[in-house]
């Protein structure tokens, strides 16, 4: 088990889909991020673990253009996140705590609405493809309010990937899901990973997080305390190691 932050946080920046350098975010006297740096190559899946208040959601908000950092930089697919360029918006998909779905619309109506926002060609075909990928084709004409929490989360991923983004951000996607819904969501994310999407996910679910990723980060008090390849992680003893890292 690696016991400290890997010093080579950006070994191959010239080939990286995501390049983050010394991101800092202050809220008055509170430092939510204090110098986060890392690279992520195309098709890699990074899971970020950390307690509440570690700065995980703040990091996701900055990387998706929803919040400006106090200092530092972030590049995604060659686009500067700080400029919030429309082209960058087309490269990313975001699943946050809110599903961003309209409960009184059907699944198909929801995706057709977003397809029009993205000015997609063949919007109905794209919407039906996304619904099928979520395993919800038999419920596509049902109002989203009738869906279970797990089904709504799968629909949220269908919404976030409708425009075929190259990078996907997920903030605590397994929260509130039962075992069946968790497994269905894992299958959906597995397919996206196979499809070479670059994925960053925050989660408290250690089992799911380790099972799906290529790289692991532990974040606390605004810093990455660990950033390592899953191949170098002692999976059987990770929970104990995780607790030790947070207590240092």
Give the predicted meaning of each segment.
Residues 64:
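Helix-to-loop junction immediately C-terminal to a conserved catalytic motif
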Residues 203-204:
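H-loop/switch region of ABC-family ATPase nucleotide-binding domains
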Residues 168-171:
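Catalytic Walker B motif of ABC-type/P-loop ATPase nucleotide-binding domains
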Residues 72-80, 88:
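Conserved ABC transporter NBD signature motif
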Residues 112, 116-139:
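Conserved ABC ATPase "signature" region
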Residues 49-51:
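The feature captures the beta-strand-to-loop junction immediately N-terminal to the Walker
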């Amino acid at each position: 088990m690696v016991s400290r932050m890997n010093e080579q946080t950006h070994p191959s920046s010239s080939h990286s889909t995501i390049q983050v350098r010394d991101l800092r975010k202050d809220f008055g006297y509170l430092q939510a991020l204090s110098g986060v740096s890392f690279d992520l190559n195309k098709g890699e899946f990074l899971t970020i673990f950390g307690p509440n208040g570690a700065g995980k959601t703040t990091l996701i908000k900055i990387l998706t253009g929803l919040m400006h950092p106090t200092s530092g930089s972030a590049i995604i697919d060659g686009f500067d996140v700080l400029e919030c360029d429309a082209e960058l918006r087309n490269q990313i998909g975001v699943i946050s705590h809110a599903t961003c779905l309209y409960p009184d619309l059907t699944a198909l109506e929801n995706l057709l609405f977003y397809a029009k926002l993205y000015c997609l060609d063949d919007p109905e075909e794209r919407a039906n493809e996304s619904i099928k990928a979520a395993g919800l084709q038999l419920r596509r004409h049902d109002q989203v309010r009738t869906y279970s929490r797990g089904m709504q989360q799968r629909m949220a991923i269908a919404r976030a990937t409708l425009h075929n983004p190259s990078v996907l951000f997920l903030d605590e996607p397994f929260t509130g899901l039962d075992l069946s819904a968790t497994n269905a969501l894992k299958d959906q994310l597995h397919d996206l990973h196979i499809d070479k999407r670059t994925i960053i996910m925050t989660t408290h679910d250690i089992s799911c997080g380790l099972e799906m990723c290529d790289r692991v980060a532990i974040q606390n008090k605004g810093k990455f305390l660990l950033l390592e390849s899953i191949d170098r992680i002692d999976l059987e003893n990770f929970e104990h190691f995780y607790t030790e890292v947070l207590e240092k």
